[in-house]
Curated annotation (Swiss-Prot):
Family: Belongs to the cytochrome b family.
Membrane topology term: Multi-pass membrane protein
Subunit structure: The cytochrome bc1 complex contains 11 subunits: 3 respiratory subunits (MT-CYB, CYC1 and UQCRFS1), 2 core proteins (UQCRC1 and UQCRC2) and 6 low-molecular weight proteins (UQCRH/QCR6, UQCRB/QCR7, UQCRQ/QCR8, UQCR10/QCR9, UQCR11/QCR10 and a cleavage product of UQCRFS1). This cytochrome bc1 complex then forms a dimer.
Protein name according to UniProt: Cytochrome b
PROSITE patterns cross-referenced by the UniProt entry: CYTB_CTER, CYTB_NTER
Top-level taxonomy: Eukaryota, Metazoa, Chordata, Craniata, Vertebrata
Amino acid sequence: MINLRKTHPLMKIINHSFIDLLAPSNISAWWNFGSLLGICLVIQILTGLFLAMHYTSDTLTAFSSVAHICRDVNYGWLIRNLHANGASMFFMCLFLHVGRGIYYGSHLYKETRNIGVILLLTVMATAFVGYVLPWGQMSFWGATVITNLLSAIAYIGTTLAEWIWGGFAVDKATLTRFFAFHFILPFIITALVIVHLLFLHETGSNNSSGINPDSDKIPFHPYYTIKDTLGLMFLLLILLSLALFSPDLLGDPDNFSPANPLNTPPHIKPEWYFLFAYAILRSIPNKLGGVLALLASILILLIIPFLHTANQRSMMFRPVSQTLFWILTANLMTLTWIGGQPVEQPFIIIGQLASILYFTLILVLMPLAGMFENYMLEPKW
């Protein structure tokens, strides 16, 4: 069996990736989120597959088919709740994974980071088209508002929006194609995950101290498989608690009403994991400017490595950068809160200040902090 694991063409790849892989001996629980994201992806694909067996992507029957899944299909309510709350867990792990990368300097592995940002954008696209499928009020109006942002693009905007819609507004054609996108994108994500791992295993994992760990490495199995299993237990505990006790906690009450193009909800908002970007979009009183700020809020992750001015890789021994990082975290939480509030004072000005602070922290203050820390570490005699 040992020989087969090391000689079989397929088993050999799995062996080098998950069993005999050498990993730094000092990586903390913050390195669990990669494997948890893999588990989340598997859960989402499996639950999504069973939901797709009963769902109909037609404007007349979509809402009813979701109700049918919850009422008439064996454990349909559980599958639907796991899928809906699994998306929230997916994004929670994603945000923690990205935050870990920034804090410990893992983003300096540029190829891994680039694929990671593409993965983040693809997952966000998948979640957006998936949110439209139940065809509730917030599904319909969320799709209308977000796809309408394409019309802000000069010359081709309106044509592009109508091309995405398959008509002059969000309707049956839009729902059908969004279902097709939502079905195919997770498999594209799976392919990107494999590429992400391929690039990661070219360099090996970073570690919390940020120094080269080659002198002290241990095999992935059994040490990190057990550690990841503990993380998985916590993930399943939270996911099952959400799905079984408060399945609608993170949803929107408006989505219990079927889509009605003649009745606009008082406050249109996306799912909680998009609220920070939605707050940045709304903070600029110009359509094109808002769209550009929305894109910049995510794509800024691509330039973070070029803004890394510190001589040390990790923030573990950089107190000024640490402080700014946690201010950035608090700022993102503030933006998430603002995104869920109505467009009125004082929320407008708080959102604008938080948006300015978000970009200032990443583009100006954190690079300056790195330079300052370099200066403080230089011998002065």
